[in-house]
Amino acid sequence: MDADKIVFKVNNQVVSLKPEIIVDQYEYKYPAIKDLKKPCITLGKAPDLNKAYKSVLSGMNAAKLDPDDVCSYLAAAMQFFEGTCPEDWTSYGILIARKGDRITPNSLVEIKRTDVDGNWALTGGMELTRDPTVSEHASLVGLLLSLYRLSKISGQNTGNYKTNIADRIEQIFETAPFVKIVEHHTLMTTHKMCANWSTIPNFRFLAGTYDMFFSRIEHLYSAIRVGTVVTAYEDCSGLVSFTGFIKQINLTAREAILYFFHKNFEEEIRRMFEPGQETAVPHSYFIHFRSLGLSGKSPYSSNAVGHVFNLIHFVGCYMGQVRSLNATVIAACAPHEMSVLGGYLGEEFFGKGTFERRFFRDEKELQEYEAAELTKTDVALADDGTVNSDDEDYFSGETRSPEAVYTRIMMNGGRLKRSHIRRYVSVSSNHQARPNSFAEFLNKTYSNDS
């Protein structure tokens, strides 16, 4: 008997077949660099920076920016942002810089140039006759890179959220050490004309390069990061959520995974912790792998590890976390089952902690405490099974365990308890639910059961 086949009749004829469905066609690519070559892009001929500044500023004022010219200018302007490397900087075996080296964002990557000239048109007319200062260059670079952040803000953020962000960014780039070079609201007007620029590979690459540089190098113009910070751990929401989750429940990654009682976690956990990826290395290329073009399909996104993502945010919802209530449910990754497990884990970690004395008046008190704890452990080991369960908890110190949670789930037939449902409904009904959010899912799924 083939376990994958089903048998049925059609017009009295027995049919045996294997049901096959559409599978995920994406091939996840890991970002590890194996050829010891820095990330690389190719741009047009390097421009005269003064001419390029005037052209790009003119285009910004007219809300008509040429993406090729903008990228060429941003790459050339890297020379203005020289800083000192604080430590030897290596990633994936590549030596980026030695301690004390003077470096610019260009030191992190390779930018190849062709002989093709840019347009460098004066779309908005000629306003600046003198050559720009370094602070004016820095302001223009900051405003241009902020277009990346604005284009990453999703439509789910309602009201004037994006406009308010643009206003705050403009304020940064019109105060020292920057200088005002555009009129108010120019940034938002320009953004509307290039709202999808985060999808342009070269622009995204340059945003990631600037962010990687300013995240490590102390610099007068480090505030430029306000527009590029979204490139850090981009398309890593699954891994980022897991990291936040283990900090929230105060467990190690290994301890937390022991609570993941579902077969669909197996492939995702293997995918998320593929060896050799520098996930835990500070200032690695890994942090900006998406923008630097090291992976076309991230294995760390919410879609790539959807069951893990769903579980984490159902636990977050149980604990009343706004971030989890607002997050988008991965509908194809068993949200109903994940909500059940999330309820039990939420109950396990909500309003409960493991505590012990760690600070003492003097060394004598510390030694007395340690001796008392040792005695308590010896008593627990010699336990003959006659103490009641409350004392057993006290002596063993075992207030949390995957085995206990798993047993409770099995005893309840894999269903949520009424107390879980009441908690879910309580946190979700008091929240302004966004479309397809966890709050909306919980409200629609469990509100009638409460």
UniProtKB/Swiss-Prot annotation:
Report the subcellular localization.
Answer: Virion; Host cytoplasm
Write down a Pfam family by its short name. Answer: Rhabdo_ncap
Q: Which residues form a coiled coil?
A: none
Principal location: virion
Maturation and modification: Phosphorylated by host CK2. Unphosphorylated protein N seems to have a better affinity for leader viral promoter encapsidation. Phosphorylation of protein N in ribonucleocapsid may stabilize the interaction with protein P, thereby playing an important role in viral transcription/replication.
Q: Does the keyword Ligase apply?
A: no
Chain positions found as Phosphoserine: 389
Q: Which keywords does this chain's UniProt record carry?
A: Capsid protein, Helical capsid protein, Host cytoplasm, Phosphoprotein, Ribonucleoprotein, RNA-binding, Superantigen, Viral nucleoprotein, Virion
Q: Which GO terms describe its cellular component?
A: helical viral capsid; host cell cytoplasm; ribonucleoprotein complex; viral nucleocapsid
The organism's superkingdom is given as Viruses
Q: Respond yes or no to whether keyword Protease is given for this record.
A: no
**Molecular function per GO:** RNA binding
Query: Can you state the subunit structure given in the record?
Result: Homomultimerizes to form the nucleocapsid. Binds to viral genomic RNA. In nucleocapsid, binds protein P and thereby positions the polymerase on the template. Protein P acts as a chaperone on free protein N to prevent it from aggregation before encapsidating genomic RNA.
Q: Which family does it belong to?
A: Belongs to the lyssavirus nucleocapsid protein family.
Free-text function comment from the UniProt entry: Encapsidates the genome in a ratio of one protein N per nine ribonucleotides, protecting it from nucleases. If expressed without protein P it binds non-specifically RNA and therefore can bind it's own mRNA. Interaction with protein P abolishes any non-specific RNA binding, and prevents phosphorylation. The soluble N-P complex encapsidates specifically the genomic RNA, with protein N protecting the genome like a pearl necklace. The encapsidated genomic RNA is termed the nucleocapsid (NC) and serves as template for viral transcription and replication.
Q: What else is known?
A: Displays a superantigen activity in human and mouse, activating mostly V-beta-8 subtypes of T-cell receptor.
- Tell me the protein's name: Nucleoprotein
Instruction: Please tell me the species this chain comes from.
Output: Rabies virus (strain CVS-11)
Give the gene symbol.
Answer: N
